[in-house]
UniProtKB/Swiss-Prot annotation:
Protein name: Pentatricopeptide repeat-containing protein At2g20710, mitochondrial
The species this protein was found in: Arabidopsis thaliana (Mouse-ear cress)
Residue windows of the PPR repeats: 138-172, 173-207, 208-243, 244-274, 280-310, 314-344, 349-379, 384-421
Key word Transcription regulation present: no
Subcellular locations according to the entry: Mitochondrion
Residues annotated as transit peptide in the record: 1-86
Gene3D superfamilies from the UniProt entry: Tetratricopeptide repeat domain (1.25.40.10)
Length: 490
């Protein structure tokens, strides 16, 4: 995919409007009926098949003589990103650049960088970043690159970008600090969390509610209840900080992890009381998950009923309630929710069937998991790497390694650039094939991985040594040039 950079930094232009007739022909077109509910954004929202081109929807809209505003495209990209439809969002971003009547702002370029990383991988995002002139690499662009590395937990590169931002004077606010704080928590670097917080104090960078909630989350991860409680008391006493529902939800999560259910429920109730109308949808999604972790099914269903009464009923709600029920190992209730989703929800979201597949796999119900996969492939025409990898892991947990190898091979065959194989599945399959003396099967797996650029010979040796497995068989294959030698990815 070509990612065209159009940094036409000129005087501000109006919010451009485009008709297909202006681009491709001069004949008259018949505008679509004046249906207020038939908008381009609604058409895009209904076209949820990730394997289909979203540009066809846009072309169809233009062919009917309709208008396309730059602001509308921005709204559509925002919506697609919100629902993790990154490939479709990138297609529209590319389309905006290719049709020069649409002004491309520096913010658009930063969003493009983020989308390229999500769709094509960090390597493609880095190439795109290098095409941008030095004088145009602003705070937003560096911030987007920092987010790309942080989201993939590439710590050393994120730290490099953070240092560059510091040298360029881009650390005036707390946002970059929050990104790094969150990354340190996710990578278990808790001493760096304290160090960075002290740096914020030294540089007089005022923390915000996200800073507070990230620190509370760090306490909950390590089950430091005493530290969490003391920190919360200090925050409550700080008149300059306005705590929100998430503050008490994160505190509740800390209590849940420590097994202090009653204290957790007290915090969850306090969190609910602080939810305002604008945040209600997202808050209920989070709180359902926490109530599920606390084993309170009746509270999950209470919030689910409230959630369904809200305007704008989204797939994220189904994801939250299904996740909550799975935490309580209630697969029968999950199946009922799935039936409700299939019957009344038209927007396809692969994350929802993926949750059911995972639930079946954890319970060893592999036939049912296969049924869901067959529906995805046959009805929705969707073959996703993650789908097959979930099946492979399920068969591995069930001790059916022959089936695990079969499903994982299919995952590799449908994989896209940027995919990183699940190490547990990878090493289990290699170990199994080695134990079976299946040299040909092992060669095919390694060849597929190498051809698609997912793993190198050196990386495979590194992973195998870390897992305590034999490396001689892979070493022999490396010498036979079945896999390409590359730098080890750690």
């Amino acid at each position: 995919m070509k990612h065209l950079l159009l940094l036409r930094l000129v005087l501000p232009k109006p919010n451009y409007i485009l008709r297909r007739s202006f681009l491709f022909h001069s004949g008259k077109t018949t505008p679509s009926p004046l249906d207020p509910y038939d908008t381009l954004q609604r058409r895009v929202a209904r076209s949820g098949d990730p394997s289909a081109s979203i540009i066809k929807v846009l072309d169809g809209w233009l062919d009917q003589g309709n208008l396309v505003k730059t602001s509308e495209l921005h709204s559509i990209i925002k919506m697609l990103r919100k629902f993790s439809r990154f490939s479709h969002a990138l297609q529209i971003s590319d389309w905006m650049s290719e049709h020069r009547v649409h002004e491309i702002s520096e913010g658009d370029v930063a969003i493009r960088l983020d989308l390229i990383a999500k769709v094509g991988g960090l390597g493609e995002a880095e190439k795109f970043f290098e095409t941008i002139p030095m004088e145009r690499r602003n705070y937003h662009l560096y911030g987007a690159l920092l987010n790309c590395y942080a989201s993939k937990k590439v710590l050393h590169k994120a730290e490099q970008v953070f240092q560059e931002m510091k040298e360029l004077g881009f650390l005036k606010g707390c946002l970059p600090y929050n990104v790094m704080l969150n990354l340190y928590v996710r990578t278990g670097k808790y001493t760096m969390v304290e160090k960075l917080l002290r740096e914020m104090e030294d540089e007089t960078v005022k923390p915000d509610i996200f800073t507070v909630n990230t620190r509370l989350h760090a306490y909950s991860v390590v089950s430091d209840v005493e530290g969490m409680e003391k920190f919360l008391m200090r925050c409550e006493a700080d008149q300059g900080l306005h705590l929100d529902w998430r503050t008490y939800a994160d505190t509740a999560n800390g209590y849940i992890k420590a097994g202090l259910t009653e204290k957790a429920l007290e915090m969850l109730r306090k969190s609910e009381q602080m939810v305002n109308a604008q945040k209600r949808k997202h808050a209920y999604e989070v709180l359902m998950s926490f109530y599920g972790a606390a084993g309170k099914k009746e509270e999950v269903y209470r919030l689910w009923s409230l959630y369904k009464e809200l305007d704008g009923f989204y797939n994220t709600g189904y994801i939250s309630v299904i996740s909550a029920l799975l935490k309580m190992d209630d697969i029968e209730e999950v199946e009922k929710i799935m039936e409700e989703w299939e019957a009344g929800h038209s927007l396809f979201d692969i994350r929802i069937p993926h949750l059911l597949i995972t639930g079946y796999c954890k319970k060893g119900m592999m036939e049912k998991a296969e049924e869901v996969v067959n529906i995805l492939v046959q009805k929705w025409r969707v073959e996703d790497t993650s789908t097959w990898e979930r099946l492979a892991l399920g068969y591995k947990m069930a001790g059916k390694m022959e089936k695990a190898v079969e499903k994982w091979k299919r995952a590799i065959e449908v994989s896209k650039p940027g995919w990183r194989p699940h190490q547990v599945v990878l090493m289990s399959c290699v170990d199994y094939l080695e134990g079976q003396r299946d040299m040909e099967g092992l060669r095919k797996i390694l060849r597929l991985l190498s051809e698609r650029g997912h793993i190198s010979y050196d990386q495979l040796l590194y992973d195998m040594n870390g897992a305590g497995l034999s490396w001689k068989i892979v070493d022999a294959m490396g010498k036979g040039r079945y896999v390409e030698e590359r730098e080890v990815r750690i």
